[in-house]
């Protein structure tokens, strides 16, 4: 791989991963390490993207006593089977080298945030009450189109059950509720404070209990009016539950922006999903997504997951040390001193994606961004629907299963989800996050770095593209030279096809003019 563009990416990754060496060079225990040492941490959402990094960080950098993981049965796999899958993820490789006996620090709690009492047995509940010191509640249904009844059960009632459990814990030091920076997206300026919603969390739960699912689905647009989806609506309700029910607890609310790949640790560019803007980049890189809508000059409030987790862990440390009149709220978003636009994200993603193209791309990557929906629908038909129908027809003729229209339905669904956030401009206050940064000593600033003012966006976008290719698309780095050759062939095919199309269009126009003139 002697290509200078590829070497730039690899060198950028090397410089970022050197940060992990700096972490290992910290010899004396830092204040945050001492805080987590021998503590019992109860974590919800541990099998998710965000939760994996929380677990990895605690096991690799701190001497945490025990992590109690609330895990539900899913797709026929119980909690114990799912934990095996969890630790097979490559994101834990470095942690396993540093802490080979990590399994001794993991206790599985079978349960479900949507169930009464979290579905936890009496014995396990007693274990939590006696041994847990820190509660990190990150579990949520993040599906924007989730049915309202289920979204309320998990995001709202689940939060109420967590608070109820936290009140029973004998030696609780900190409770962190993970919300989202876009919970209050019905407003354009979002401060680090509580806001009142259209109804209380308690009333929303009562409403979902007394109405059947069909009726609730019918009424959903009216109930969530002012919010783009059930996810943001129920996140507002969950914050209301914290405000009303957890005032006497050492509690804080952590609101991350749009979370993307890791920046530096434990490995650069790691991700395990295609949600949000990362899915858009994969769609463009694979040659499938060719048109997108939004105001590309709006700010992109994206944050790397490793820095986000560091800030969350620091918020728990801070609430355990200080008493506040009202629960502190942290908007963890890019700092005003160091922000990028959606245009920068999309264009850089496209540029770096062309440097290391995907081996399984179905066409030469090209994309167009339009601000108006009428433009978007016209171009979607021309660039997405029409080619998909042709390709599916060919697949049927040769006896294979058509799949392009199914793919495009998913893509259009993703585009519809993101257009609200890319078309509207949001401004966030982050004074509490800045103050939290200043409370860290030099050791913790290295061990738990989360100052977004220090982020190098160019490096982040480069390693993100590499990570998406490696961890999501499953393209091995060794096939990059082969992929570049294929990319060049697709480029020739693309422009040849365009030339033929325009030639035929010109001929047809000439024939029509000749016929009528």
From Swiss-Prot:
Per the record, membrane topology reads: Multi-pass membrane protein
Annotated TM spans = 378-398, 492-512
Q: Which UniProt keywords apply?
A: Cell membrane, Lipid biosynthesis, Lipid metabolism, Membrane, NADP, Oxidoreductase, Transmembrane, Transmembrane helix
Any idea what a deletion of this gene does? Tracheal morphogenesis in embryos is grossly normal. The tracheal tubes fail to fill with gas during the final stages of maturation, and instead remain full of fluid. The hydrophobic outer cuticle layer of the trachea appears to be disrupted and forms membranous structures extending into the tracheal lumen.
Protein role: Catalyzes the reduction of saturated fatty acyl-CoA to fatty alcohols. The preferred substrates are C24:0 and C26:0. Necessary for the final stages of tracheal maturation, to facilitate the transition from water-filled to gas-filled tubes. May help to maintain the integrity of the outer hydrophobic envelope of the trachea.
Per the record, the similarity remark reads:
Belongs to the fatty acyl-CoA reductase family.
What is the protein name given in its UniProt record? Answer: Fatty acyl-CoA reductase wat
Species whose genome carries this gene: Drosophila melanogaster (Fruit fly)
